[in-house]
């Protein structure tokens, strides 16, 4: 309720489009200016060297996890998306985590106790943890091997995921560049399947 009231106080109906899009653009700019490029490169290297890649995001961050999982699935054969069906079920999946694995923990306000606990649990296994979050004061940061931050301050009651999505997009593109040959082969096979089974909805 406080978020709705605060958003309504900041902008009139006629200003919503300008306010939201401008605020989102500023978040991407601020994220770019503050990005730790060494941490970004380290995160990519950890992912490239992982035995398995586990991804978890909860609440609205689950969308980011799904996006990452979809494209990582084109880049790797060892990706495991943990869907937050319930607290105990999450830990059942995490029991399989090995020290040679990487766990990507995606969490933005409001943080959930479950993902904080899950991140702490994985860190104790010796696996590498990549935290994608809003600030270095996020509760998942103390349990991470490397942290990437993206701005997500809310201009309305809706969580702004534009900057986090852009950061993940950059990570996918960077990994794709490093795995250019494999990506080209995968996409080539995928296009052949589309053509063979007429799966493309748009023909140019």
Where are these regions (language model features)?
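HTH-adjacent hinge/linker in prokaryotic transcriptional regulators
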Residues: 1-38
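Short, charged beta->alpha transition segments
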Residues: 15, 38-43, 89-92
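Exposed, interaction-prone assembly regions rather than primary DNA-binding/catalytic cores
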Residues: 33-51
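Glycine-rich phosphate-binding loops that contact phosphosugars or nucleotide phosphates
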Residues: 48-58, 62-166, 170-180
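Short, flexible loop/turn segments with low-complexity composition
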Residues: 182-192
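Short, small/acidic-rich helices and loops at N termini and domain boundaries
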Residues: 195-198
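Conserved small/polar residues in nucleotide/adenosyl-binding loops
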Residues: 202-204
């Amino acid at each position: 309720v406080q978020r709705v009231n605060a958003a309504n106080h900041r902008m009139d109906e006629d200003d919503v489009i300008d306010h939201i899009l401008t605020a989102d653009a500023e978040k991407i700019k601020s994220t770019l200016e503050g990005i730790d490029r060494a941490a970004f490169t380290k995160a990519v290297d950890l992912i490239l060297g992982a035995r398995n890649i586990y991804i978890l995001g909860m609440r609205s961050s689950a969308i980011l996890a799904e996006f990452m999982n979809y494209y990582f699935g084109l880049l790797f054969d060892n990706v495991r998306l943990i869907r937050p069906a319930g607290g105990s079920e999450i830990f059942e999946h995490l029991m399989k985590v090995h020290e040679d694995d990487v766990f990507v923990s995606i969490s933005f306000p409001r943080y959930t106790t479950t993902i904080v606990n899950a991140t702490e649990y994985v860190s104790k296994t010796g696996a590498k943890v990549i935290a994608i979050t809003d600030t270095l004061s996020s509760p998942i940061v103390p349990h991470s091997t490397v942290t990437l931050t993206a701005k997500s301050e809310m201009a309305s009651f809706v969580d702004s995921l534009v900057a986090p999505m852009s950061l993940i997009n950059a990570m996918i593109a960077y990994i794709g560049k490093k795995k250019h040959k494999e990506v080209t082969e995968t996409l080539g096979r995928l296009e052949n399947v589309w053509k063979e089974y007429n799966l493309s909805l748009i023909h140019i």
